[in-house]
Amino acid sequence: MSSAVLSPDRYINRELSWIAFNQRVLAQALDQRTPLLDQAKFSAIFSNNLDEFFMVRVASLKSQVEAGITTPSEDGKTPLEQLLTIRERLIPLLQQQQDHYRKQLRKKLLDHNVQLLDYSQLNKHQQQWVSDTFRHSVFPVLTPLAVDPAHPFPFVSNLSLNVAAVIHDPESGQRQFARVKVPQKNLPRFVSIPTELSESDPKPIHTAVPLEQVIAFNLDLLFPGMSVQGHYFFRVTRDADLELRDLEADDLMLALEQGLRKRRMGGEVVRLEVPNDMPEDVVEMLMNGLAVEEEDLYRIDGPLGLDDLFGLMALPLPKLKDKQHSGQTPTVLARTQQHLIDEGAIKPEEFESIFSVMRQQDILLHHPYDLFSTTVEEFINQAADDPQVMGIKMTLYRTSKDSPIIAALIRAAENGKQVMALVELKARFDEDNNIQWARQLERSGVHVVYGVLGLKTHTKIVLVVRKEQEKLRSYVHIGTGNYNSKTSKLYTDLGLLSTRPELGQDLVELFNYLTGFSKQQSFRRLLVAPVTLRKGMESLIRREIEHAREGRDGHIRAKMNSLVDPDIIALLYEAAAANVRVELIIRGMCSLYPGREGLSESISVVSIIGQFLEHSRIFWFGNGGSPEVYIGSADWMSRNLDRRVEAVTPVEDPNLRGRLERLLELYLKDNRGAWDMQSDGSFIQRQPEDGEDVRNSQVQLIKQWSQGVPQS
């Protein structure tokens, strides 16, 4: 467990570090070098990230304040002080986002004949079409709810967009309120209008108006006989974190389902978003009805819920998007694709099973540059159909809908193989999906387990056991990312395919640890949390310190999502004091101060934000000239090291190790998506020097793969 106590001047608050990360995401939207529709995408990601941050992190801090907890975080801030600072940091970012939407995005889309219009900008023909559409496609699903002494304040669901209508009763003379929920789950946020109705010349490629405005300007149909005096939009965010204590739940699935029902009904409101021009009496009515305080209120200068800008990526305008990368099949696996026989691309006698290739060498996969479908999915598909395969075991943390991997596991069970799937039911915001997969797998004869009591299983591992010449051989995949067909195209992740006996035996014992009563305390090659990973990582860092103290080169390079563990940070400061060179590539939260005189002068931190979400974890240690490199599922966070099951594997093939070393070098030289962390914790985006070529690491990797997938 983490035990280091760092003074506030040595530790950056994790919540504020997260906001700095999301600010870098927003910067991608504001950067005019980013293609226009990708600007919309990054703005949507910024909003979506912020929703989850409020639902989990802000909700947790508010709960602490309500419980009277004043214990400071590692940087010396109480929960209340953190909440106030979060608000202070967010308000200017939200204004930047709205300014970009209004002054940049909409105007520049118009230059490309894409019209995102307000209702007031529609011509009479468009308004008539919208009114007709409202009557037959929107009106029937709306439910206006009155707010008065006879009608209690209606429940407002999490992340819902709503219309607050101000109604005047001509008979009584009373001014009343009503709430109408915008049916976003049933209808698109932006209503497409036939382009031929436009009076523009040339005709637009796409014309749309926000659904909430369509509803607002037709409220008279919802309140016949009444006078609609005004309408105002509002959006609510609720506490959505599930508090699950395994020891209190005999049936984890039942407990989760109850928790999910509670989440859908909604926890306490943690954020209320309203437009700047909402009258104070309407604001007061909402605040009282939703039981929110002034610090929970965010006044927004523009449309609410900009996460819906994701929908613009569907527009058929490739010139306004980053060039799409379809991925490649590694050359070494080119003849392992069953579909090539069906398509006549190779002869049946030319086919080579993926198992045959794995017996000859370790294979390093790098997604999305390497196709997930022709590598990891093909591995599991061939295992499901191969008569010599006796069993398949794997962990599932987040998988996609209509998952080919789930289908393969079911087929394997139907083919008589022993199949075990560890489905992590507690994967946040994927719980419902995972419950459905678990039930489907169980019905098909797959042994389904839910992991170790009190721990979340985050490791990404597959074990295939195959009978060969009366002996059993283990084939393994150990990765950094989820077995998810969709995110494999959006996230960068690494995976190792191997038949090394020690790795195979380690996975056999790790799965026994996950499914039985094993108290395994050591592994041959793997570093496993919560058993050996923390000790192993600390030992590797200390070894670099010893190398440096004895006059050899001490050098650490590590790439991960987040670095917030106090013990690891304290040890890295100790490494810096010994003059170990520490180069960190941290996409998200980083609580360490780099480059501080007398503390961390030899430590540098860079963050890469690009077309793909950087998700791979790599740990490289110079070891006095005999480097060792590891990949796996864990960040340097207390939860990964102590409260989750994680697996990190050494990459022992010299060629593959060299590939990873060159990959780290490529990231460190990036001058397009890279942000350098300063000694005060702020970030500055790198820019090419005059005459210097732009080095975008992700674009360079796409180019490398298009010219032939690296094999060594």
From Swiss-Prot:
Provide this UniProt record's keywords sorted from A to Z: ATP-binding, Kinase, Magnesium, Metal-binding, Nucleotide-binding, Phosphoprotein, Repeat, Transferase
Query: Kind of enzyme, top EC level?
Result: transferase
**Could you tell me what this protein does?**
Catalyzes the reversible transfer of the terminal phosphate of ATP to form a long-chain polyphosphate (polyP).
Species this chain originates from: Parasynechococcus marenigrum (strain WH8102)
Can you tell me which residues form the catalytic site? H458
Q: Which domain of life is it from?
A: Bacteria
Query: Binding of Mg(2+): at which residues?
Result: R398, R428
Q: Give the GO biological process terms.
A: polyphosphate biosynthetic process
Q: What is this protein called?
A: Polyphosphate kinase
Q: Which InterPro entries match?
A: PP_kinase, PP_kinase_C_1, PP_kinase_middle, PP_kinase_middle_dom_sf, PPK_C_dom2, PPK_N_dom, PPK_N_dom_sf
The cofactor(s) it depends on are: Mg(2+)
UniProt keyword Magnesium present: yes
Q: What modifications follow translation?
A: An intermediate of this reaction is the autophosphorylated ppk in which a phosphate is covalently linked to a histidine residue through a N-P bond.
